[in-house]
Structure formats: C-alpha cells, structure tokens
Amino acid sequence: MNVLVWGTAEQGPCAYFRGHMFDEEWKKMGINTRHISRVNFIAKPGAEGMETEEAMAKGLLSVDTSDIDWADVVMFRRYYNCSAKCNTCGVATKDQAAIRVHPHKMEFRDSITEWLWPAFESETFDKAIIYETDDNHFQIRPWNGYFPDVKAEWPLITRMAKRADLLTTSTGPIAAHYGQFNDNVRVIRNAIDPSIYTTSNPRPEHGGSKPRVVYYGSTARMRDYAGYPSGPGGKWEGGYAGKAIEELRKELWNVFIGVNPGTEHVIAPFFDEAFHYVENIQQFAKNLASSHPDIGIAPLGGDDFDRSKSELHWLEYAAVGAAFIGEGFKYGEAPYSMVRHGVDGLLARTRTEWYEGMKSLVRSKDLREQLAGAAKERVLKEYDYKERAKEWADAFKWAVEHKGIWKNGRRNT
C-alpha cells in the first residue's frame, strides 16, 4: 500500500507525531509513505514567461500527478496556508482586491492545494482520502499568533473534512466537533518513541540539589503559565501554575524549554534556566532529557481549544522520568483525563490545587519518584509508537476498502 502525505514539513511536532515517527514501522507492514511539500508542473514550449493560470488555460502547463498516481491513499493534514500573508502587520487573506490594495508586501505561500481541491472533490477521483488533524482549528483564539492564518482556511478545512473517506484525529473532543462534517471519524491517540528521550549529559550543577521544575512549549504558552488579561477591564485570569511556583521559588530550580528568538526578555523574569525553541523532535527530546526534570508541568488556559489538546506533555515528561502535574478540567474529556490523580500524576485547576500540588511535589522526593515511576511504566505499555503504527495501518486499510464512501456522507450540508 502506498500513502501520500500532502504538504507536510519533516521537522514539526505535528508532522512527526502524526506521521514521520511511524514511517519505518509502516514499511515493515508493507506500507510505503511519501511526504511531499511541493507539486511539480510540466511545461510545454510557449509557456515561458506566462502566469500559471494563463499557461494552464492555454494547455501549456499541467500538474505532474506522478505522486498522486503512485498513491492508494492521499492524506491531508490540519490546514494549508493558501492565503497571502503580510509579515509586517500579520494580515492573512485570500481576497484578491484586498491583496492588491494592502499597504505592505503580501507573501503568497501555498498556491496549489486549494486550486487543486476541486479535482480531489471530483466524482472521478479514484484514490482514498484521509483528513487528519490534531487540533480543533475552529476553536483557535484570536490571541494565538496563528489565528489569521487558520481563520482564512476555515472554508477549505471544512471541505477537506467533508471530502475525506476517513477523518482521523488525536482526541475525543476534536472527533466530536469534526463529526458534524464526516460520519467516519477515528481517534488515534498520540504515542512516543521512548528511545529518543535520552541524553549523555550529566545533571547540571546549577540549582544544586533543588528539584528541577520544567515547562516546555513556545513563548506564546507563557499565557498558560502566567495568566492573561480578560474582558473589557483587563482583569487578570489564570496563571495559577506560575503563581504557585513563584511562592515556592526558593525551594526549586525553574526551567523553560522553547524560547522563541527575540522573546528572551519575556521568559527571563520567571525562569532560572531556559532552552531555545527547536523544531526538530529528536533534538527537542534530547533537550528535554538534558534538562533532567524532577517535575514536569502542563498548565492550560482551559478554553475549548485547550480541551482538544492531547496528553503529549504527560507522555514526554514520563519518558524522561519527571513527576507530572497538569491542568484539570471541571467536566468532560480533557487533555489529561487519562492521568490517575495521585497515582501517575497530579491534576490541578484552581489556585489552591496548583499550590498544594506543587508544594507536595517540591517537598517530597518519594512522591515524585512514585508518580514518575508509575507514569513511565504505563506510558511504555500503553503509548508505544510501534503499537500505534498498527492502528494507523488499519485506518489506511479501511480508507482504501471504503474509498468513495464520502459520497454518501454530508458533502453538501
């Protein structure tokens, strides 16, 4: 079986945990994967100097479909930046009139995916299609730096979700939301390759014997850690994890992994040590292991976008032997619902819960080791990427066997 992954980046965490990590395991099962980030064109004499649309209209330029022809399954993922983007003010739009009059230079990024989409929607297209997402892009908040990009793609995301023969995702809340577009939704939870979470670097001497508390993400995730202004009056909300750590600061060594260039000044007041953001997952895993965390924290703001996130922080902290404390939600499935509070991690939602949880972890090495050990044992058993690869293989097989089933779905709703 041949699987074509459309427009994916090798480095990023989403592409890795929902694709590249499994390539070698899939190969053992007879599944070949091809990840492409561009489409080639075949030009005939006379096409030189013409705009793409003009050359194609005159029959002088055609899409090289060899990758698509090779595939049994084509997988589309998350969203594609088909809008034009202003890198000066952050505006993203597909409105040609707005692009022409915009005062700054607009950068065109993916000009092919949306343009080709009618061909994938065609009744004559004979390949199975999977749409995969590990975020609920319809719940992204305006403060998120990717909001303009994602909002511009909502119509295409909807079309992709409706067109798919099978829709795959990482969590129940995403599956519930995207189920309005497609009857065939399968949850395939994230997994890890424990072999990459290792290091030969010794435990750093700075911080001495204090327990090392680690938080990772990107600088934007400081909103989850330190809180945020809300409402017309700008009342400060959240930030309970950061407040708890500040109150215990003299008893711990605080580490952040994921500083974006140029934002060091944002991180510096809160942390004793920091690592810059890296996109390559193997390098990130090494950095995480090299930080030698005793405690790994995973605060969240708690909105519907956050509710759709996966348990990846818990998995990765467990892999490097850190005791976990993460955001609890009042009701329903949430990122860390699978964590057994007091057994293989702690959950906290209120300011009191975060403080009491952090205090117990900081002051008890025995508790840290107990929680970390139980979490690692469970993660190695239940979240092995080799087992998850089999779930993906079954999804590919199902999609091929049911290709065209989307025609009986909700395409026109």
Locate each region found by the language model.
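N-terminal pre-catalytic "stem/leader" segment of glycosyltransferase-like enzymes
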Residues: 1-89, 93-95, 102
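Conserved catalytic-core segment of nucleotide-activated headgroup transferases in glycan assembly
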Residues: 10-25, 193-199, 204-291
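Carbohydrate-associated surface elements
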Residues: 173, 191
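Nucleotide-sugar-dependent
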Residues: 223-228, 232, 236, 282, ...
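A short, well-ordered alpha-helix in the C-terminal region of glycosyltransferases
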Residues: 360, 367-382, 391-394
